[in-house]
Amino acid sequence: MQKINNIDGLRKLRNDFMESVFKEGIPRVRVCCGTACNATGSKKVIEGIKAEASERGQEVEIVKTGCQGLCQKGPVMTSEPAGYFYQKVKPADTHELFVNTYEAGVPARKLLYRDSILEEPYELMGDLPFYKKQLRIALRHNGLIDPTDIKHYLAIGGYGALEKALSTMTPEDVVEEIDRATLRGRGGAGFPAGKKWLHTKKAPGDIKFVIANGDEGDPGAFMDRSIMEGDPHSLIEGMLLCAYAIGAGYGFIYVRHEYPLAVRNLKIAIRQAEELGLLGEDILGTGFSFVLEVREGAGAFVCGESTALVASIEGDRGFPRSRPPRLSEPGGGVWGYPSNLNNIETYACVPPIIEKGSGWFRSIGTETSPGTKVFALTGKVVNTGLVEVPMGMTLREIIFDIGGGILGGKKFKAVQTGGPSGGCLPESYLDLPVDFDSLRKVGSMMGSGGMVVLDEDTCMVDVARYFLSFTQAESCGKCPPCRIGTYQMLGILERITQGKGEVRDIERLIKLGKFIQEGSLCGLGQSAPNPVLSTIKYFREEYEEHVYDNYCRAKVCSGMGVFRINLNNCIRCGLCKQVCAYDAVKETRNDFIIDNDYCRQCKACYHVCPVGAIKIWKKSLISLYERFEIPYEQLEHIERSTKMTLKDVLESKPSQMVTCTKDCKISDAVTIMDGKNVGSILVMDKDGQLVGI
């Protein structure tokens, strides 16, 4: 394509592509070629489609798109003109796809999404519960265009915001529009982008930089990666608008090298924009110049921190430094020049704000957190993937309406938001609106958008240990509170999860966590204790069980509990005896038993048992089980629902409102209470008779 020298040329070229690209009525498939779908075979599916089309002599346009969101069901694709949405497509399915979709004009039912095998499938993407409540702004082009073809981006109105800004708006107008939109940074801190832009604009000096933070290091988070892979021109246009607004001539996109597809697509997009005259010197003949390049990072989590990121761009080790000066001030940015730093999703939201206006953006979301947010929904949820929803949507809607609920019909336990620096929220917060301020108030954070769903089989102490082990390993080691404090906290957590917890460990964790928050230099250290402190706040009873009862209710931690064989379930296969390294499993004439004098709670027998006959019990409840013949599960239920140990219950006295009887069996009473799901207190006399409920 020939270089465009003026705004009219851009407008004409866009109109031409709108007419010539994506013509209506022709056979077309939009196949997801994001990282997740590539891993599940989308490239082979495309080869299968090409081979089938060639064999039939039929022309089918294939659009290799970015991530379409429903990563759990990849490879996914849509077929046009009917718009059928297909999931888990395999190369062998292409024949059926052509026979049904393009010959008979009906969907290939085998490939349609359905909630369960007994329910009717969904034909269109917009009808799926996963997509129905989503509203796409940052991901608006993902799944529609080929990210390596600038014609596709122009054909759907791309660079229209840049055209509008250069032709009808001053730099001050652009800054003011972003400020009025109250666009808050999507990288985690939630600082208003407009105020950051204005601060950089007012900084003295002719040389300024625009930086995009694509160093997405949170485990299980892939929001920014999907934008860079699937819609790189949206990012470039957002950075161009920022550069025009603040008077910057240079820019960097900082991406971790573990994102090879994102790096490839970004470099292709930059080259295409340069060839077309949308990057470089004298853009569209307006006198505005902007040079952009990709800088690859080595993958250190700390380089997501702004000052460490700048140091990495400059070629130094990614060490955070104290502020001021801020990045937007002289001496604070790249090579000392004022620099504006936002994350990928923030820049992707800028073009639609300029095109549609700040009022449109503020009409979405909440008053203090307008717009949408992209979340990487992962963990023990039916539908994992990328979701973009208006700010203020509740956790329940995201997890159960969009995510489809908990895998295997299990019970929801917690959700971890904000990545390794975020917090864990219990079931009581499912109706909490998701926005910056609401999450911060309850001890968590938005972060970059990670959302990990946890079920009843998850140990919250182990979750805290996992996230702290990540942040501790990623600490740069510059400041002692983070370097030494996280090491000490991790040591305590590892001791607790190995059944070696000490009485004062919980208070030590709280004290250390607060010290690290107050004394660390950068955001990584300041937020590192969040998973530990939030789990202690909301799941303290699990910590107490680990420390005081040597018991893990989720049966995750080794070295805890009393191992027993449920003889009613045992099939006498002998696998438990074969794997026991300590000869703790003994074989009698009719049964297998576990000798707890030899048992080291390694859980080898627990994992190998094919019928789940190995049970792990809390030692303090075994005597009650044996003495009163109360089912163990009911004992655990009563203890948890009363929020008291049965030892506390037995030592308590009945109140004046308690009806006392002396002829009631304890097992009968507990069965009645458990059946009604009543959290009750049992009081017995010295002979073991029930004297109060």
Predicted feature locations:
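Accessory "access/gating" subregions that flank catalytic or transport cores
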Residues: 163-204, 362-363, 368, 373-377, ...
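Flexible inter-domain linker/hinge segments
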Residues: 110-180, 334-337, 342-357
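Hydrophobic alpha-helical positions that pack around
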Residues: 133-134, 263-391, 403
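Ferredoxin-type iron-sulfur electron-transfer modules in oxidoreductases and energy-metabolism complexes
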Residues: 3-27, 42-64, 81-113, 161-178, ...
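Conserved phosphate/anionic-ligand binding catalytic regions in large, soluble enzymes, centered on
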Residues: 36-38, 178-200, 299-311, 472-484, ...
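Short amphipathic, charge-patterned alpha-helical segments
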Residues: 238-242, 391-409, 669
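Iron-sulfur cluster-binding cysteine motifs and their immediate structural context
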Residues: 73-78, 481-487, 575-593, 604-622
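Tandem CBS (Cystathionine beta-synthase) repeat/Bateman regulatory domains
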Residues: 620-693
